C-alpha cells in the first residue's frame, strides 16, 4: 500500500513540481513580482495563452470555451508611417556603424563616396531609404496661378520647377514619391508660389507701402486654414510635417503674422539667412539657380585646371553692402582678381568663369546668390562671401572640401588668401567641384541625387527627426 502511494505521489507530484517551477521562473523574470505586461507578447501569442488558460480552468463550463474573441486593434495610418520611419532610421544607423549600405539594385544609380560628404554611408543609405519609403502629398486645394504654378526660369526658377515636378510629373510612372492618397504620406507640401503671389497680387509696386506683406500673409494663412479644416494632417502634427519651397526674397516672411502657429512648419528657402529667422534644425536651404529659358542649365565652358589663367572672377551689380565693399577694393584694380559691375562687348560671362580658378560669390541684397551654382557648373571653386548664410544641403555636403569661405572683413585680403592655397589642395577642390555638380543639376523628370531629389532629401531628413504621437 505504501509502495503504491509512493508511486502515485511521484506520478502526481513531479508534474505539480514542474508546473510550480515554471511558474516561478516565468514570474520572477519580471521585477517586483508584477505580471508580465501584455505588450511583451505578440497579439497571436497572447490570444493563444488566454484561450488555453480558460479551457484548463473551467473545462466543465461551456461559456468559457466560447468567450468573445479578443479583438486586435489595427494600427492607424500614422502608426504605420511612424514604423516605416523607424525602420529607415535603424537602417541608416546600421550603415554608419558597419560602414556598409544595403540596397535594391533598382535604386543604385550612383554611390556617394569621398570628401564632399559629411558621412557618405549615412547619406547613401538615407537616400536609399527615401527612394523606398518616402511619400509626399501635395495638397490639391487652390487654383493657378497662385497655387500649383510658379516661375520655371531665371533666379526663381527652382520654385516653379519643384512645384511642377511634385504636383504633376511625379504623378506619372516615375512618381515614386507622390502619395496616391494623403493617408499614405509622411510629409505634406503646400504648393503655393511666393514669386507668383508677388507678381500677380503686388505688381506694379509704385510706393514703399506696396511692399507691405499683409496680403501675402492673408493668402498664406487662408490657404493653411482651408487645408487644416478640410484635412486632419496639419492639426495632427501642428504643421511639423508640412513644408513649402521658395526662392523669392519675401519667402522668409510668410509665417510672420502667426509665428507661434507656424513655429514647426518647414520652409525650403534660397534666402537662408540665420540672422533673419532661418532655423537650421527645421528649415532647409535650397540653391538659387538661374535657369535659362528653354534650357535647364547654361552651356559648360569650363577649362582644365592648367588652362584656368584667372585667379578669381566676379561680374555683377553692386547690390548690397558686401558687393559695395568688394567693388571698392577690387573693381578694375587687379589682373588676377577680376571684378566687374558689367561686361564689355565681346566678353562672355560663362567663358570667363570657365577660365577662372576661383569664382567670387558675394551676397547681394539677400544672402542667396546664383553665383555658387554657376561656379559649380563651370568647374570653378566657389568663394562664398556672406554673413549668416546657411549653405544648401549643408546637412550632407561638406562645403569646406569644394569651396572657400571668406568673411566680409577679409575682402581686402582675397588675393593673398587664395594665392596661399597650395596647388595640390586647389586640384582636390577642383575635382570635388566636378563631383558635387550632380547634386545641383536640374533634371526633368527628376533623377536620383539631382537637385530636386536633394531638396526632397532635406525634407526627408527633417521628417526622420520628427516622432509624431499616435
UniProtKB/Swiss-Prot annotation:
Single GO MF descriptor: glycosyltransferase activity
Localisation per UniProt entry: Golgi apparatus membrane
Source superkingdom: Eukaryota
Primary subcellular site in the record, as a coarse category: Golgi
UniProt cross-references to Pfam families, sorted A to Z: Exostosin_GT47 (PF03016)
E.C. designation(s): 2.4.-.-
TM region(s), chain numbering: 8-28
Keyword annotations from UniProtKB, A to Z: Cell wall biogenesis/degradation, Glycoprotein, Glycosyltransferase, Golgi apparatus, Membrane, Signal-anchor, Transferase, Transmembrane, Transmembrane helix
Residues carrying sugar: 100, 235, 273, 307, 388
InterPro entries with a match to the protein in the record: Exostosin (IPR004263), Exostosin_GT47 (IPR040911)
Cytoplasmic topological intervals: 1-7
GO BP term (any one): protein glycosylation
Keyword set includes Cell wall biogenesis/degradation: yes
Record topological domains on the Lumenal side: 29-470
Phenotypic consequence of gene deletion: No visible phenotype.
Any single Gene Ontology cellular-component annotation: Golgi membrane
Mode of membrane association: Single-pass type II membrane protein
Enzyme type, top EC level: transferase
Assigned protein family: Belongs to the glycosyltransferase 47 family.
Function, in words: May be involved in cell wall biosynthesis.
Protein's name according to its UniProt entry: Probable glycosyltransferase At3g42180
Record organism: Arabidopsis thaliana (Mouse-ear cress)
Taxonomic path: Eukaryota, Viridiplantae, Streptophyta, Embryophyta, Tracheophyta
Amino acid at each position: 500500500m505504501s509502495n503504491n502511494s509512493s508511486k502515485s505521489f511521484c506520478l502526481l507530484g513531479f508534474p505539480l513540481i514542474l508546473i510550480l517551477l515554471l511558474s516561478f521562473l516565468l514570474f520572477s523574470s519580471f521585477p517586483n513580482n508584477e505580471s508580465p505586461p501584455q505588450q511583451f507578447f505578440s497579439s497571436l501569442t497572447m490570444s493563444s495563452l488566454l484561450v488555453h488558460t480558460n479551457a484548463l480552468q473551467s473545462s466543465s463550463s461551456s461559456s468559457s470555451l466560447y468567450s468573445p474573441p479578443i479583438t486586435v486593434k489595427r494600427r492607424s495610418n500614422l502608426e504605420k508611417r511612424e514604423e516605416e520611419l523607424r525602420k529607415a532610421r535603424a537602417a541608416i544607423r546600421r550603415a554608419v556603424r558597419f560602414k556598409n549600405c544595403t540596397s535594391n539594385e533598382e535604386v543604385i544609380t550612383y554611390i556617394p563616396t569621398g570628401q564632399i560628404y559629411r558621412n557618405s554611408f549615412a547619406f547613401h543609405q538615407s537616400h536609399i531609404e527615401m527612394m523606398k519609403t518616402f511619400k509626399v502629398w501635395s495638397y490639391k486645394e487652390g487654383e493657378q496661378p497662385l497655387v500649383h504654378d510658379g516661375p520655371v526660369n531665371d533666379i526663381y526658377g527652382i520654385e516653379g520647377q519643384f512645384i511642377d515636378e511634385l504636383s504633376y510629373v511625379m504623378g506619372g510612372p516615375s512618381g515614386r514619391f507622390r502619395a496616391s492618397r494623403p493617408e499614405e504620406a509622411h510629409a505634406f507640401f503646400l504648393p503655393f508660389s511666393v514669386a507668383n503671389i508677388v507678381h500677380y497680387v503686388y505688381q506694379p509696386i509704385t510706393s514703399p507701402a506696396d511692399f507691405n506683406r499683409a496680403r501675402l500673409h492673408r493668402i498664406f494663412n487662408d490657404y493653411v486654414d482651408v487645408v487644416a479644416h478640410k484635412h486632419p494632417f496639419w492639426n495632427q502634427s501642428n504643421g511639423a510635417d508640412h513644408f513649402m519651397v521658395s526662392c523669392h526674397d519675401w519667402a522668409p516672411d510668410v509665417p510672420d503674422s502667426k509665428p507661434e502657429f507656424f513655429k514647426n512648419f518647414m520652409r525650403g528657402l534660397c534666402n537662408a539667412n540665420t540672422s533673419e529667422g532661418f532655423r537650421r534644425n527645421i528649415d532647409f536651404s535650397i540653391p538659387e539657380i538661374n535657369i535659362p529659358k528653354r534650357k535647364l542649365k547654361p552651356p559648360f565652358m569650363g577649362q582644365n585646371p592648367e588652362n584656368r589663367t584667372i585667379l578669381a572672377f566676379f561680374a555683377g551689380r553692386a547690390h548690397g553692402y558686401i558687393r559695395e565693399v568688394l567693388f571698392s577694393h577690387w573693381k578694375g584694380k587687379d589682373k588676377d582678381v577680376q571684378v566687374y559691375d558689367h561686361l564689355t562687348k565681346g566678353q562672355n560671362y560663362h567663358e570667363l568663369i570657365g577660365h577662372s580658378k576661383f569664382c567670387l560669390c558675394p551676397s547681394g541684397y539677400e544672402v542667396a546668390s546664383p553665383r555658387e551654382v554657376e561656379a559649380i557648373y563651370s568647374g570653378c571653386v566657389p568663394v562664398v562671401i556672406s554673413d549668416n548664410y546657411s549653405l544648401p544641403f549643408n546637412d550632407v555636403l561638406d562645403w569646406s572640401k569644394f569651396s572657400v569661405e571668406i568673411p566680409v572683413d577679409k575682402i581686402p585680403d582675397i588675393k593673398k588668401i587664395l594665392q596661399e592655397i597650395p596647388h595640390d589642395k586647389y586640384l582636390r577642390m577642383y575635382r570635388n567641384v566636378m563631383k558635387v555638380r550632380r547634386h545641383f543639376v536640374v533634371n526633368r523628370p527628376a533623377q536620383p541625387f539631382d537637385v530636386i531629389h536633394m531638396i526632397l532629401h532635406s525634407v526627408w531628413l527633417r521628417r526622420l527627426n520628427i516622432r509624431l504621437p499616435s
